[in-house]
Amino acid sequence: MKGQQFKLWILEFREIKNSHYFLDSWTQFNSLGSFIHIFFHQERFIKLLDSRIWSILLSRNSQGSTSNRYFTIKGVVLFVVAVVLIYRINNRKMVERKNLYLTGFLPIPMNFIGPRNDTLEESFGSSNINRLIVLLLYLPTSFVQVTDSSQLKGSSDQSRDHFDSISNEDSEYHTLINQKEIQQPLPEEIEEFLGNPTRSIRSFFSDRWSELHMGSNPIERSTRDQKLLKKEQDVSFVPSRRSENKEIVNIFKIITYLQNTVSIHPISSDPGCDMVPKDELDMDSSNKISFLKKNPFIYLFHLFHDRNRRGYTLHHDFESEERFQEMADLFTLSITEPDLVYHKGFAFSIDSYGLDQKQFLNEVFNSRDESKKKYLLVLPPIFYEENDSFYRRIRKKWVRTSPGNDLEDPKQKIVVFASNNIMEAVNQYRLIRNLIQIQYYRYIRNVLNRFFLMNRSDRDLEYGIQRDQIGNDTLNHRTIMKYTINQHLSNFKKGQKKWFDPLILISRTERSMNRDPNAYRYKWSNGSKNFQEHFISEQKSHFHFQVVFDRLRINQYSIDWSEVIDKKDWSKSLRFFLSKLLVFLSKFLLFLSNSLPFFFVSFGNIPIHRSEIHIYELKGPNDRLCNQLLESIGLQIVHLKKLKPFLLDDHYTSQKSKFLINGGTISPFLFNKIPKWMIDSFDTRNNRRKSFDNTDSYFSMISHDQDNWLNPVKPFHRSSLISSFYKATRLRFLNNPHHFCFYCNKRFPFYVDYVEKARINNYDFTYGQFLNILFIRNKIFSLCGGKKKHAFLERDTISPIESQVSNIFIPNDFPQSGDERYNLYKSFHFPIRSNPFVRRAIYSIADISVTPLTEGQIVNFERTYCQPLSDMNLSDSEGKNLHQYLNFNSNMGLIHTPCSEKYLPSEKRKKQSLYRKKCLEKGQMYRTFQRDSAFSTLSKWNLFQTYMPWFFTSTGYKYLNLLFLDTFSDLLPILSSSPKFVSIFDDIMHRSDRSWRILRKKLCLPQWNLISEISIKCLPNLLLSEEMIHRNNESPSISTHLRSPNVREFLYSILFLLLIAVYLVRTHLLFVSRAYSELQTEFEKVKSLMIPSYMIELRKLLDRYPTYERNSFWLKNLFLVALEQLGDSLEEIWGSASGGGPAYGVKSIRSKKKDWNINLINLISIIPNPINRIAFSRNTRHLSHTSKEIYSLIRKNVNGDWIDDKIQSWVWNSDSIDDKEREFLVQFSTLTTEKRIDQILLSLTHSDHLSKNDSGYQMIEQPGVIYLRYLVDIQKKYLMNYKFNTSCLAERRTFLAHYQTITHSQTSCGANSFHFPSHGKLFSLRLALSPGILVIGSIGTGRSYLVKYLATNSYLPFITVFLNKFRDNKPKFIDDSDDDSDDIDDSGDIDDSDDIDRDLDIDTELELLTMMNALTMEMKLEIDQFYITLQFELIKAMSPCIIWIPNIHDLYVNKSSHLYFGLLVNYLYRDFERCSTTNILVIASTHIPQKVDPALIAPNKLNTCIKIRRLLIPQQRKHFFTLSYTRGFHLEKKMFHTNGFGSITMGSNVRDLVALTNEALSISITQRKSIIDTNIIRSALHRQTWDLRSQVRSVQDHGILFYQIGRALAQNVLLSNCSIDPISIYMKKKSCNEGGSYLYNWYFELETSMKKLTILLYLLNCSAGSVVQDLWSLSGPDEKNGITSYVLVENDSHLVHGLLEVEGALFGSSWTEKDCSRFDNDRVTLLLRPEPRNPLDMIQNGSSSIVDQIFLYQKYESKFEEGEGVLDPQQIEEDLFNHIVWAPRIWSPWGFLFDCIERPNELGVPYWARSFRGKRIIYDEEDELQENDSEFLQSGTVQYQTRDRSSKEQGFFLINQFIWDPADPLFFLFQDHPFVSVFSHREFFADEEMAKGLLTSQPAFPTSLEKRWFINIKNTQEKYVELLIHRQRWLRTRTNSSLSKSNGFFRSNTLSESYQYLSNLFLSNGTLLDQMTKTLLRKRWLFPDEMK
């Protein structure tokens, strides 16, 4: 049964025609419904290789219940089937049968799967463009031999149904179909077709225009009768199509426009054009032009710019117009009737035209003499296919007949070159032109070097230079391109006909030079299969290939093994050799280790295509094409992902115009290869039908923007017609360094206005560097930086530039020495010149390797190309990656003199010149040796890589062993000549002998000797490199480059990789997959274990694990042995190299080993699980050993079986642990080594349980909280670094919708959203979530509770970084009272910049950490440095995790904290970003954002700010629910509905809420309840308010009772849907300090519906308590109770005036009262401002709000005491403005009204200064002093004057508060009357004594903010109430008309009328108030439901 099921599945897979059907059939197995999505996702797939996950998956069905044995068997069978099927894809027979298309989930380029036996039917159902879609799916083979048109209709209908393709309805089409016999291709033809290089990568249109019928003769022209030909010409060019496919119509609109504006001049400049056979058709020029108008594709592909004519010409110099016309006819057919054109019919045969071949060739070659100076026919490299006999004929006749004097080199050569391209139809038309250039080879060779050899992405570029001596072994034109352009490569021996480029095409299969067709077919079928396998494997290789591509690109052609090996000068040459060897080994081994995992998926070779590597560096953050492309092939950008791409910036700059070089070449790179898979990438799998809609197209943009870029007047714009046309067809070319074509549009990046508009200097810099690449030695101009006028803007500048550019590429600029290796060398290096960091060094290699330069030239060279990197206008992101390029580019060291001569001292200049001369001499000496040895070694490497798949067989297994050893044997004699190496290695082997024995015992392999042999050969080389680098410092460039710690670590990584590769290459497939499942995901992290100090640290923590012996996976022991010997040997090298000599190194090692003499193998074996071991190593690899030793000390002081909670409590209570370490070690004590399996599965389908709302009442969260919660959830799902597929419309829209959801959640409370002016929603342009969050909130808003709640809800590690270690003194600001803050130690100035990881003895460090009192200052500084290092190393080890940095404002840069600040920034934003796997979320919090250093608020740092506000009541419920739920308690379902309890305010801030929660939970625990009900909340509120009766007593002052009753009554009457706080007779003593919780409640409820009428209602609420107290509480309170009552009244006054200020801020520019007649329905005249405030008023208001009170007090009060009288107003004003502290007014009610962050003053400066704590200042603008005023001044009050008639607002200052608002009508000014002192109104004050008492106090400063000024004054409260009454009485009497005109009257009128309204309201409800008072006194508590 099992075998039968297996076969059925195989058959079903083969016959699949639809991806949807495939997925449907697959998902029929319900237990594997999620298996598909997991299996084909890279990270999930890796997880699934874990056996434990499989055991869970296979033991459960989709419902989660444990299933029977059937499910397990079924899952195993399906897994085996999947593996076998993937193997079958790569099988050659499977390829030929072409029946398996895994299009749905494996987007494999389909042309790599099946042979090209495409027939008429397959191409019938689509038009040209939509052919791209059909490529994703082929019809089954049953349709191949069909000739019936009805069946064809069915085929087309099927295709149309699935893919929205276009069906041609023309009946003649079907007639023509039946006229031609359709035959099945023969197998040989299929093989040849597979072998055709034109098939490996499909070109742009992918239309099968010319590749349909294989059965015709490939040599002769297809015989087609004229009648049929005529019919084909008459077919409509634009077939019928559906409405959504209108793009093709726009194409022809553009073509019609072009044909009317562009003149076509047929030029016949060659005599050979007249050599036309008589029997050819004659057509005049006019017919030809008219014909072309019918077929405008012709001239679109062949418009070449002639410099002399300034027009577009069709160059067909060697053939007649008639022959061209015939070719055009064929091309027309290829477009109109693509199904009827024989591909082989285009094989241009000279015999078929009756032309004398000898005469023809002679004429053609001779005719080039006159035109060679005018232009070079480097034609658009069009896709071509020729026949062998034609080439042989041409070659033979060329050898016979061509004149020898045409070549400078008498040895005759033949040049045949062509390139993949867009068009496949006019191939022979271009082919003949290519042959013209055979004659003038020397002339074009350098041009081709400059252009075509940089075009390494053309896999099918054939550019062979063959000598006539080769004879029959001549290079066949169909072979894959060979870059054997140089003569010495063509001199290979006959046995060495395969030359490989090992680092680019790792397993590229080439056809050998012999013309054996069988070998040709075989190898080409392999090539096609290999390419297919490459893409299969790449689908799952997201960042396994990225490292390889990036590194290989930098140094891909520069491994010249013996370039500088000078055996006479070993030490110097070794540096050069190692710089290449190490980089090569690193690249090869990285690729090997990264590609091995896919051998068990893809058994074939894995060619790495050139285009993928170069696309890698062009990824732009906003470029949809590149994003789509890279996502489709599975690449991910790591270090360049935030970098502006060097050649392709974004959506706009990708439309660059073609860079037309009219002088020397004619658009040579316009039609470079566009790979088939790149086209497929546009057909997004999720949105296949809409991939061509107008929104995603450029057709409409082009057709509607003709004035900008299709203007025929400007030749530069016209030169971009072709490129713009192709850009219009949705394929913007990737501007590789090989594609020198800029796309010109209205946003052409060279335009100055665009650059200025963008305000990004990086654009100038990028393209400036690009042009510097072009103009290498004739540096015409530079565009680096600045806003220069570029030379490409106007027509008159084009000509000189063209001439200069053409001169650059003409060979007189190149050396004529005959040494062709120069060009090989230069061309090999060219592909990396687009990298501005590497470019200059490459030039150094190229120029120096050719000819020695003079001293002056060298100086000029350095000034030109070796400018300091700091001068390159690097952006932040580029500069960040600079070190990465420097580290990995070994060429930077060859001549690294980054500063020009003028900056160097004379001595240094001489040394550098001598050094350069030596380098030049070496370059000459080893030229010959390089030619023989280097490529010999490379060939061996290539053999090794080509046959790598053989290692699955025993034969290949043995062969590879020998080959591997043979490859390294060439290097061994060179390396083994150093005696130092021998001693070092012997030392290593001796000291690690026990480790080697253990390893040998564990392995028990017969190949042990082989491993030893390889190790002996390879290990010493790398160790020697480290030693020599440290001991030979003659070259400052090399030593500086390779001495950095990163490079040292990298060198050890190479050694490590080498050991792994030796084993893995020789291992069976199953074992490789097993090793990969455990090691591959951790491999990059394990590498850092090789640092020796960490080796010792690792031993300390292993005590924590119980001893558990088991036969573990012994491959890890290989790792561990390598770690052990590395740690032992390299520590000694480090110690001796660090300056202390060998003794120092040995001493340090021995001192460390003294106490910890434990073998690493034994320690690791303690850990039971292999995965646990790797996870443990990862989690602890970066921890500083000091903390680990302390932890080990903990383990020794407690029993081993204690649980972590006891350890944690011991840490908290132990005196032997320093406070600095305590907080950190608690986190460390609960360190988990790996995630649980349920967490891994949970991460795939996760839901937030706390997001549920079971309480049945409205519970909401703040938007910032929601965003953070979503962010944490996304991080848990490993999506933090997910690169969104920006060209996938569905994914983009999904992300944007999700982004809107998490960022713009409504904070609704039954009211509308905010009505602030211009309050728009934010929008992020970058499709990525922010990994850095800055949480801003006032003190008490609960930032720490929010972050801790998120950490509680996430299973990710939560690590707190305490920055108070960095502060050099006591804090000047109050810390957030709810944030964690330790005691702050005074650490003094930090000027010690020693190494952080200083090696100290263990005892010393423990003593330092546990006995702080014995520390010196230096030791304390060292510990401070150690502390931050310890924290961040743990963070990196624990990744992914959440970092919380509370009070980040403490980290401001000053002289003492700059070191810490640099450490923090470096750890957070440089180290973490280097690794693509980092998934760290950084959350910083502050309540003083102005103190946060701006460097931290940057796009790649804390780029998202979240403002946390005080909680609204629904948010309080949510928070309360969360706090309860996370502790295991649940709320009653309808708790907030019962008895109106839902409106109760639970706390004025988050701390109160937490305290209430704790109180309620404690009550629930005592009552043994797990559900919290209403009674528990009541009890908790009651107990919390009572405060256990210790600080609470009943209030004796009945005034406060009346105050509460009045406030509650007003709330109930006016705002029925708002919250009402319970009232009681109990009041805390603290209430006078904290203020009522109602303050912020009312304001924030108000904030959600900010309307004028709402403001009035709230204003009445705020005044209600005071009014009732004034009316009822007549008895004078005593002093103590007056304090509490006053605070409430004072807060009310603040809130009243705050509301008025809010109204002024919101509606300051509202209409005046007379303008509101049209708004009668919504007319609230009280709240209309007469006019907006002017800026001068704002400044004056700000100046009057805060004054440096110390200055005023000291300067002025002393003068008053001396009796000097009135001061000079001007002097006061100057002093005032010189000492102003800008801030909003202090009267804001304690930050409740507007938080200090949200409420800036009118100047936009937020409020921080608390500058007057203790002085009273009265502002007045009256010069004369009245009696009362004199009394005030004499009693110590200060009076001063600001500018006359400018300040309209004045005020009293109490100790930190205003008595009234400065704009209060107490102090308003009359505009129409003379100034009158406000204090002249005697009736305002009850009496003079009351006024004195109210406004005077002791002049001394109070000790705290809570010390009220009126405490020492008797009966102050009573007088205050009288003041209120008299104030209202006075306001009622002030009815002067001028009063109503003043700016401040609206406020006085509002307050007056509101007071009257409330008085009438309460007097009319006196009975109700009396009843409430009695009830309150009886019940002691009144809740809102009882008040109703």
UniProtKB/Swiss-Prot annotation:
Any single Pfam family the record assigns to this protein: AAA
Alphabetic keyword roster: ATP-binding, Chloroplast, Nucleotide-binding, Plastid
Subcellular location: Plastid, Chloroplast stroma
Domain of life of the source: Eukaryota
Cellular component aspect of the GO annotation: chloroplast stroma
HAMAP family for this protein: Ycf2
The family this protein is said to belong to: Belongs to the Ycf2 family.
Protein name: Protein Ycf2
